[in-house]
Amino acid sequence: MPLLWLRGFLLASCWIIVRSSPTPGSEGHGSAPDCPSCALATLPKDGPNSQPEMVEAVKKHILNMLHLKKRPDVTQPVPKAALLNAIRKLHVGKVGENGYVEIEDDIGRRAEMNELMEQTSEIITFAESGTARKTLHFEISKEGSDLSVVERAEVWLFLKVPKANRTRTKVTIRLFQQQKHPQGSLDTGDEAEEMGLKGERSELLLSEKVVDARKSTWHIFPVSSSIQRLLDQGKSSLDVRIACEQCQESGASLVLLGKKKKKEVDGDGKKKDGSDGGLEEEKEQSHRPFLMLQARQSEDHPHRRRRRGLECDGKVNICCKKQFFVSFKDIGWNDWIIAPSGYHANYCEGECPSHIAGTSGSSLSFHSTVINHYRMRGHSPFANLKSCCVPTKLRPMSMLYYDDGQNIIKKDIQNMIVEECGCS
């Protein structure tokens, strides 16, 4: 039974390899049009007819992805002036200085944004009481300290207002960052001593907001620039003093917390009567202040750099991406394809030695690593399997073209252009 299961897994794995490498296309077409990278890699490159054969493979692939059996017959092309006017009105593209149409690459931008969002971490850090009165301490996790580009950072505070409050409708809340300096480098003065600030410290206004004091609710204070400075300095903690001079007059209170339990304080930092009841504290636990951080690693961060596929330069024989551009004007297709001017029909070629099979960054890396583990140890039936050089990253492409009825069509095609190659 285990052997039968193993054979089944092997067959499924081979099917995954075959199905993962091509660009998806319509059913009912041959494998070559569905996978230009695979088709181009198998064609001879040195023969006299190699270039025409490669171009024909690209043509079939484009028609397949547009769900066309043949190229549209454009017998009476639309006058260029009318075409350009329609494009401007429909906002599907723009006309360059050279008169050529350029497509607004919304799909490409969306793909880049999605990739960026996948690399962004969101961290919520709950506050602890600081070393002085009315201060909060936020300790960013190790996950956060490994990030270096702040997309967004906010401190969330809950303002509790008694139901009978009508004396003041607005209060001002200020957040000050507590900064520690080397001994003797700063004159803190009497005010710092009154605030309970020990040592050489200064304050920097982080955020200021006028809020409604007629209802209990959360208030958000942006602190992105401050968190960015902390990360740039290699620090991972933020100390904040909260100030609300009008809170006492209005009866409102900011919900802060102590070392072991949360407490309510008024504008002067004094504990309010009746706020230490166990039931009340349990009820208010959800109002604990917190810091919300969205950040990512920088482009040049050593841990962020994933292994990118090689570019074929004629000097390497291992798996790499071969650049191949087909101009629609050169192949006589610019009469029905309005934009872009050509297609980057990149493909993968090269050898896959055992030591690079299943490399990091490949969408097939986990599967490949498992197979390669058994293959290198001679375990049958994996011993005779060979790694393949396949696309590991593809990007979309937008096309603007005429159909047989002289209609202008804009189509966004996923997984159209090979960006990186790797060993399966």
Swiss-Prot record:
Gene3D superfamilies: 2.60.120.970, Cystine-knot cytokines
Residues bearing glycans: 165
Keywords, alphabetical: Cleavage on pair of basic residues, Disulfide bond, Glycoprotein, Growth factor, Hormone, Secreted, Signal
Disruption phenotype: Activin A-deficient mice are born but die only within 24 h of birth because of craniofacial defects.
Tissue/organ expression: Uterus, ovary and liver.
Propeptide residue span(s): 21-308
Ranges of biased composition (kind: Basic and acidic residues): 264-275
Start and end residues of each stretch annotated as Disordered: 264-306
Signal peptide boundaries: 1-20
GO cellular component term of the entry, any: perinuclear region of cytoplasm
Entry's localization field: Secreted
One GO MF term: type II activin receptor binding
Biological process annotations from GO: activin receptor signaling pathway; androgen metabolic process; androst-4-ene-3,17-dione biosynthetic process; autophagy; cardiac fibroblast cell development; cellular response to angiotensin; cellular response to cholesterol; cellular response to follicle-stimulating hormone stimulus
Disulfide bonds: 312-320, 319-389, 348-421, 352-423
TM stretches of this protein: none
Self-association state and partner proteins as the record states: Dimeric, linked by one or more disulfide bonds. Inhibin A is a dimer of alpha/INHA and beta-A/INHBA. Activin A is a homodimer of beta-A/INHBA. Activin AB is a dimer of beta-A/INHBA and beta-B/INHBB. Interacts with FST and FSTL3; these interactions prevent activin A interaction to its type II receptor. Activin A interacts with ACVR2A. Activin A interacts with BMPR2. Inhibin A interacts with ACVR1; this interaction creates a non-signaling complex (NSC) that inhibits ACVR1-mediated BMP signaling. Inhibin A interacts with ACVR2A.
Protein function: Inhibins/activins are involved in regulating a number of diverse functions such as hypothalamic and pituitary hormone secretion, gonadal hormone secretion, germ cell development and maturation, erythroid differentiation, insulin secretion, nerve cell survival, embryonic axial development or bone growth, depending on their subunit composition. Activin A is a homodimer of INHBA that plays a role in several essential biological processes including embryonic development, stem cell maintenance and differentiation, haematopoiesis, cell proliferation and tissue fibrosis. Signals through type I (such as ACVR1B or ACVR1C) and type II receptors (such as ACVR2A, ACVR2B or BMPR2) which, upon ligand binding, phosphorylate SMAD2 and SMAD3 intracellular signaling mediators that form a complex with SMAD4, translocate to the nucleus and modulate gene expression.
Recorded family membership: Belongs to the TGF-beta family.
Name assigned to this protein: Inhibin beta A chain
Species per Swiss-Prot/TrEMBL record: Mus musculus (Mouse)
The gene coding this protein: Inhba
